[in-house]
Amino acid sequence: MVTIRADEISNIIRERIEQYNREVTIVNTGTVLQVGDGIARIYGLDEVMAGELVEFEEGTIGIALNLESNNVGVVLMGDGLMIQEGSSVKATGKIAQIPVSDAYLGRVINALANPIDGRGKISASESRLIESPAPGIISRRSVYEPLQTGLIAIDSMIPIGRGQRELIIGDRQTGKTAVATDTILNQQGQNVICVYVAIGQKASSVAQVVTSLQERGAMEYTIVVAETADSPATLQYLAPYTGAALAEYFMYREQHTLIIYDDLSKQAQAYRQMSLLLRRPPGREAYPGDVFYLHSRLLERAAKLSSQLGEGSMTALPIVETQSGDVSAYIPTNVISITDGQIFLSADLFNSGIRPAINVGISVSRVGSAAQIKAMKQVAGKLKLELAQFAELEAFAQFSSDLDKATQNQLARGQRLRELLKQSQSAPLTVEEQIMTIYTGTNGYLDGLEIGQVRKFLVQLRTYLKTNKPQFQEIIASTKTLTAEAESFLKEGIQEQLERFLLQEK
């Protein structure tokens, strides 16, 4: 017969009581009232915060944007085809954040920082909020270091500094993306991390950019964030903030970063779509009232940090597309007023064969010569002045047939200077090469050449100086100044090459 031992039973009961873990979890839930067009209306979710992530029963994530008296408007980060009316939704208590690490370099990711290049998962131990506050006034210092784009027209007349925000604006097919990608290519060996954000573009265009960067070894220091035209509006709206969060990660670790938003017109359109579907009141051009804040809070995150924070920087090159050159539309004027200058690309110049098609007359950099080395300042002032005078004379010369010799000479010089600014795509020049090119033009060495010979001569001159007068480049690189010694080396080199070139061409 089995004997029942009371102490054994009490021990078992005591153990069970000790093992019992009474956990109470409070879950904030709601019910789907309506879903469609990337928007869901939820009843309940009483404690939800603006911008909080919510999770649907079948796994789709959304962002609570509209907090109304009797329902919550949620934008979906996916197609939401499996969400049903009456299904449950729970608030996650988190706001949108992404993992960040050095492992993202060389990868193509989407707005949620998931890889889309088929090369496996990315390991990351840290995470950053997609929307984080911009550095304050005390955290910044003024822009003083140049960020070279490799394009003569920009580096000499519309200089960009590290920590600046410079808008690239122009009609479709005027070379806006080409200017941005050339700038990325020129950062090779400059210890600058680049982030290229493609918003609402064709997948083929993004693939073309990635291939071009890979072929030239630029993907090693570049991250591509891509949300193509078929992505949900929510993800197109988030993509620039994801790019900014990745760039900030490097900026706060005392590194220099360059971020390109291509383009913000498409992000504004995605935001307009979301806002109209959420029944927010439309304003000018049917954009919502806070579309200025959409871009200002993004672009204010670009900064040159103070020495206490390690002097990291984030330079932003936002791109905006205009419709037949109309700079006074809503989005262009907004972004022009937020940025520190703009590079205006003209369809007329592009079609007449001037590439990059930069309209120097209405392009401006509000940082100015603070973002140039001394040697560039020495040669660029004269170039700017002569081109401005040439533009004025050219307009006047159309009405007059008999021009005096001085005017004819000035027009001839201007045409050669304009030729000197032309550059092929994906062929950025170093600062030293730019300085020698500008010096050759502004000091009249090209005046004796035919316009068609100018570019050929300059290519040969750059090669000749590199091999036969390396001292010139060494002096510029070490002193950052066009010294009398450097100038004499340059003059000798130009004279020698000019004689050789004229003999060849005879």
From Swiss-Prot:
PROSITE patterns found in the cross-reference section:
ATPASE_ALPHA_BETA
Q: Which organism is it from?
A: Olimarabidopsis pumila (Dwarf rocket)
The family assignment reads: Belongs to the ATPase alpha/beta chains family.
Any one GO CC term of this protein is: chloroplast thylakoid membrane
Q: Which residues carry this modification: Phosphothreonine?
A: T257
Pfam families reported in the protein's UniProt record: ATP-synt_ab, ATP-synt_ab_C, ATP-synt_ab_N
Query: Which HAMAP family is this protein grouped with?
Result: ATP_synth_alpha_bact
Q: Write the lineage as a comma-separated list.
A: Eukaryota, Viridiplantae, Streptophyta, Embryophyta, Tracheophyta
- Protein name according to UniProt: ATP synthase subunit alpha, chloroplastic
GO molecular function: any one? ATP binding
Q: What is the annotated localization of this protein?
A: Plastid, Chloroplast thylakoid membrane
